Amino acid sequence: VYDLKLSKFREGLPEDYISLSTNMDYIPYDDKNSEHVRIKKEIDDFMYKLFPEDDLRKYMWEHAASSLSGLNINQKFNIYTGGGANGKSKFVNLLSKALGTYADTLDIGVVTHKRSGPGRPMPEITKLPGKRYICMDESTKGDILNEGIIKQFTGGDKVEARGMYNSKMTQFTPQFEFVHTTNNLPEIKSRDHGTWRRIRQVPFKTKFVDANEVPANNIDPHSGNKVYMKDTTIDEKIDIWAPVFMALLIDIFKKTKGKVNDCDIVMEATNKYRYKQDILGNFICEMIENT
């Protein structure tokens, strides 16, 4: 067991009540170990290509490290956005591989439909206790987020649900970083601060293409974004990277204690997202002048 409070690796104790596992050994990062150095260099290159801007890359390292704590101190719902072939799923795969059974997925329908009636079974929710990283896949155009459920999962309050064919209710406090990967941003009808202070849109702007499609300067002439050759061995590399990646996240957590500092790129994307959702506000700003 790696004890985040004590910042040390120790023997597990019965009172830890641990039933989840990363499914790999903890190996501290050693900058004198040539294999560790080589793998770290590959991970750094991967992160640099995904997030060329220093501030955004720092945000994503802190975001990934915050998933270790289970404290949910940031109370955020991160939405990873961008067109296809931009590395969203590979980032999710790397973090999920490092976290083992602490990571899981959730159907987007859980947060786009109205809440189930009291006492109705919600087996999707009963698998979430103890999880540290929950990712929802693609939403479809026109999907509307139920902001009440988003607040419930990110607010630190207890959640109650019942499994299928089970009369007993499961009650727990969500401990996970809650994220959504999508090419189509879902609609958010709410305008209140309590909803939007939780939303963070993370743009994945880099594109990974076949070798014959890479521009000479690695810049897309239309978007101005970075373009790199896709790595067909990335899935095998992720399996190798995971232990070192976890060690790096623990080192970051020691410094941040799970706090994620906002960055201008994420906030700019989020504010544009919010602005587009406010149709009435857009009309007032564009069509009405003070006299």
Residue ranges, per PLM feature:
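Feature primarily recognizes SF3-like P-loop helicase cores of small DNA viruses
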Residues: 1-291
